[in-house]
Amino acid sequence: MAKRILVTGAATGFGRGTALALAKRGHTVIAGVQIAPQVTELMKIADEAGVPLKIQVLDITDEGDRQAAFANEVDVLINNAGVMQTGPVAEIPMENVRRNFETNVFGTLALTQGFARQMVKRGSGKIVMVTSMGGLITVPFAGVYCATKHALEALAEALKAELAGTGVEVCTANPGVYGTGFNDRGAETMMRWFDMANSLTKPEVLMAAVGGLANQLDPQSMIDAFVRIAEEDGSKFRNVVPDETAEWIRGVQAKTWEVGKDDAIWSSPPTG
């Protein structure tokens, strides 16, 4: 059965791919983009693909944009919009930290609250929090970003428990290291302020972390997972993709319980 689905952050990456894929399958898709020029760009892509999309400006940190979004009756909300600020936790400017939380946590939660009210009143709906593998483990030099995703995991767990019996499903989607350009753009954010000569970080530690972005995975398997999650009834709460990343996360989580003073926590995630 066709559903009404809102995908935030639909201008690029997973959001764009998921919005187009769902529309191709006959769903009514509202594609939220951050700024007006992205409307024209996405409209052209959708037209070329022969796919009907309702595209609207939805900067999730903007109250006016959120209120306009609430005018849509939505069966599935896919909270995909997000940004990544990177850099050593001991050195990253606090303004960057606040900016990352403003979008990934506060904007996402504000949008979710409005649609949760709509869904509970109707007695049905699904809320999907896109939290990343970084919501379950912590990546060096992406600690602030991972903190925002850990926060979304906590909010999703609480929301699921609190909305029990209302007919509203809550689940998470946790992508591994996929080549959408998002990780690369995030890695570049620290270069605007980071000074290696005066850093607390040893160069070899930084270089080892940057190497983890090599050979990223093909995004299609994650887009397929988003489509499955949106369409199915009774989704699993947590959806880590691919399976190899899920197994790696379990190993990292188990290891943290036994880590000693001189032991390393981090190991590189599975890539392509």
Feature map (PLM): residue ranges:
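Conserved glycine-rich cofactor-binding loop
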Residues: A11-G13
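SDR active-site lid
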Residues: G165-S235
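Conserved glycine-rich Rossmann-like NAD(P)H-binding loop of the short-chain dehydrogenase/reductase
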Residues: R25-E41
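Substrate-binding pocket helix/loop in short-chain dehydrogenase/reductase
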Residues: P88-V89, N96-R98
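Active-site helix of classical SDR
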Residues: T112, T148
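Residue(s) in the substrate-gating loop at a strand-loop-helix junction
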Residues: S132
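The beta1-alpha1 cofactor-binding region of Rossmann-like NAD(H)/NADP(H)-dependent oxidoreductases
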Residues: V57-A68, M94
